[in-house]
Regions:
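Alpha-helical scaffold domains
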Residues: 1-222
C-alpha cells in the first residue's frame, strides 16, 4: 500500500461531515473537507510517515504534488506539512517549479501564506541569488496569489529583511483593490516593524497606502 493510499484511508475513516461543513464554510466553500481537526490530521500524518518513511523521503516532491491535486483541503495541508518537513537542507535549484505549482493550485490564503513564508522564503534563503528574478516574476504575474507571495515571502526574515525590496513591492501594489493584496502589504510592513518600527512608520507616513494596508502596518507600532 502506498503512502497516499494510507492517508486517504485514514482520513476517510476519521471523516466528520458536520465539522467538515463548518471548515468549508470558513474558507468560503472553496474546498471540501473531511472534517478532521488539525491536531488529529497531524497525528494521522505522523503515523503514516512512520509506515512509509523511505517512500516519502525518496519521493516527497511527487507525493506532495499528488496530494495537492486531490479535492479535500486536508490533503493540501498534509502536502505542505510533508514538503516543509522533508525539504529542510534539501532545497534544489529546480524546486521553484514545484513551489510555484503548489502556490497556483487550489489557491487560498491558508495554503499560499504558509508556502510563501516557509517554502519560498526557505528556498530564497538557500538560493538568495534567485530572489530578484523570482520576486519580479511573481510580482508581475496575473495571479493575485503570486503577487501576495512576492509581498509576504520575507515574513520570517526579521533583521534579514530586504526593506528596499519590500518597499518596492508595496509601491507596485499599493493601489490594488484586492483585499488580499492590501492585507499582505500591511502584514509584511507590520512584521518588519517589529524589528525596525522607525523605518516602517516613516515609510507609511510618506506614501499613499490604502487605509487597510496602513491600519494593518501600524497597529502594533502605535
Amino acid at each position: 500500500m502506498s503512502f497516499v493510499t494510507t492517508i486517504k484511508q485514514q482520513f476517510e475513516a476519521n471523516e466528520n461531515v458536520a465539522y467538515g461543513k463548518k471548515q468549508s464554510d470558513y474558507l468560503k466553500n472553496n474546498f471540501p473537507f473531511y472534517g478532521i481537526p488539525t491536531t488529529k490530521r497531524r497525528e494521522i500524518l505522523k503515523d503514516a510517515l512512520l509506515l512509509h518513511k523511505e517512500e516519502v523521503s525518496t519521493n516527497f516532491r511527487a507525493i506532495c504534488w499528488e496530494l495537492f491535486q486531490l479535492p479535500q483541503r486536508e490533503m493540501h495541508h498534509a502536502a505542505i506539512d510533508i514538503f516543509l518537513k522533508e525539504i529542510k537542507n534539501k532545497y534544489q535549484i529546480e524546486d521553484i517549479v514545484l513551489i510555484e505549482k503548489l502556490l497556483l493550485t487550489n489557491s487560498w490564503w491558508d495554503s499560499v501564506d504558509t508556502l510563501a513564508k516557509y517554502a519560498l522564503g526557505g528556498y530564497l534563503k538557500a538560493f538568495p541569488e534567485k530572489t530578484l528574478e523570482i520576486i519580479e516574476k511573481f510580482s508581475n504575474a496575473d495571479s493575485m496569489w503570486l503577487n501576495r507571495t512576492a509581498i509576504i515571502f520575507q515574513l520570517g526574515y526579521k533583521e534579514r529583511t530586504d526593506f528596499e525590496l519590500l518597499r518596492s513591492e508595496c509601491e507596485k501594489h499599493k493601489h490594488s483593490t484586492e483585499f488580499f493584496i492590501q492585507k499582505a502589504i500591511g502584514w509584511a510592513l507590520r512584521e518588519y516593524g517589529s524589528v525596525n518600527p522607525t523605518a516602517v512608520l516613516h515609510y507609511v507616513n510618506s506614501t499613499n497606502l490604502k487605509p487597510l494596508s496602513k491600519k494593518e502596518a501600524i497597529r502594533k507600532i502605535i
